Amino acid sequence: VKKLMDNVTRKAEDRGKIRTLGGRACHFDLWQPVQFGIFKPLPLEEARDEYDEPLKRAFTYKALNKLIQGSAADMTKKSMVALYKEGIIPHIQIHDEVDISTESPKQVENIIEIMESAVKLEVPNKVDHEEGDNWGKIK
């Protein structure tokens, strides 16, 4: 994980952006002084005018989180599109959870298969599910 974090942070610092698994760009467009202190991150030209010292990109420490959370969002969205194409319409999606009414255990299995295969990864993506009479009764 440390190696991945260092690699992603370095890309954010060097390129000013990283890409999620779905290809969306997460930008790091603000700059701040290299020296530790309380500085307001600014666009590059403003930072050059404001701070008379070497600059670095701001918030690159958030790159790994943006990669993970952004990729999870991409995967959830692809899963929802795949479900929709099969005529399965989720009621609500919150973060990485999807609420769906089902008619049978076979349909539950089908939904899990669709969601697990929506994004091809080297390590298989597993979908957990919980069932209940209504959303409020699921623990």
Report each predicted region and the residues it spans.
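Conserved catalytic core of nucleotide polymerization and phosphodiester-bond processing enzymes
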Residues: 1-139
